[in-house]
């Protein structure tokens, strides 16, 4: 079982927001998450990203791999993610 940290789409049509979640890599995008770590609101001007940094680091230490999109979003919000 390979575990990934990725985005889960929520919200209404044309007003998306995403939860940053830990999921099995074979799960569908909107499937059941193992744990929620934070959120990303692309439409908002302020408070676009919130993440529990301790839980994120805990999952990375366990071997979870962040998706490229999650890495890009977190690096953009001044939370450095190693490649």
Swiss-Prot record:
Keywords: Ribonucleoprotein, Ribosomal protein. The gene is rpsP. SUPFAM superfamilies: Ribosomal protein S16. This is Small ribosomal subunit protein bS16. Pfam families: Ribosomal_S16 (PF00886). Belongs to the bacterial ribosomal protein bS16 family. GO terms for molecular function: structural constituent of ribosome. One of its GO terms (biological process) is translation. Gene3D superfamilies: 3.30.1320.10.
């Amino acid at each position: 079982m390979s575990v990934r940290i990725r985005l889960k789409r929520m919200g209404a049509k044309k007003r998306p927001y995403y939860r940053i979640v830990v999921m099995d890599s074979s799960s569908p995008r909107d499937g059941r998450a193992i744990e929620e770590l934070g959120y990303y609101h692309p439409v908002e001007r302020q408070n676009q990203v919130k993440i529990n940094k301790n839980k994120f680091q805990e999952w990375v230490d366990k071997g979870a791999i962040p998706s490229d999109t999650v890495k890009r979003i977190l690096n953009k919000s001044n939370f450095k993610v190693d490649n």
